[in-house]
């Protein structure tokens, strides 16, 4: 629901698809696209990134099937994995990650070396890493060694 997800929403083509988001700004951006159906999750407002999360999200998604989950993290270290600042958000991301056939992680280089309180995924839990040019080559190689596509 943060800035990385917002950049993705801006670049998403106006194509027929269903998007589930907990990001308020992401939902606003996607609402401008005629062919995109936007499902905004409710719950606790996480003020740091203007997203929402709720323990009820698991019930909401219980019968929802995801071909692809495109998620982002607030922080990453190889030791701690992908993390965020709210337990309820970590629970939501973990649940969605486990339900999806494929998981794409958006992580820009500014998040590397940072640790947030709640880990929701490890490198082996994702299929594709989407990052920026400043992402360290040595870290890219570590992902590739685990058969993770780096874009």
What annotation goes with each model-predicted range?
Residues 1-14, 21:
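Helix-turn-helix/homeodomain-like alpha-helical modules used for DNA recognition
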Residues 20, 24-151:
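Conserved phosphate- and dinucleotide-binding cores of soluble alpha/beta proteins
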């Amino acid at each position: 629901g943060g800035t990385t997800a917002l950049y993705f929403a801006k670049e998403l083509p106006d194509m027929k698809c269903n998007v589930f988001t907990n990001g308020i700004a992401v939902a606003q951006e996607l609402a401008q696209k005629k062919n995109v159906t936007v499902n905004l999750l409710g719950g606790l407002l996480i003020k740091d990134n203007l997203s929402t999360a709720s323990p009820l999200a698991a019930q909401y998604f219980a019968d929802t099937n995801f071909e692809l989950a495109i998620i982002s993290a607030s922080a990453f270290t190889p030791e701690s994995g992908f993390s965020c600042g709210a337990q309820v958000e970590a629970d939501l991301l973990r649940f969605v990650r486990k339900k999806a056939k494929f998981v794409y992680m958006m992580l820009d280089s500014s998040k590397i070396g940072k640790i947030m309180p709640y880990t929701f995924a490890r490198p082996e839990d994702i299929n594709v890493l989407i990052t920026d040019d400043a992402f360290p080559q040595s870290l890219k190689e570590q992902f590739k060694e685990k058969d993770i596509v780096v874009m």
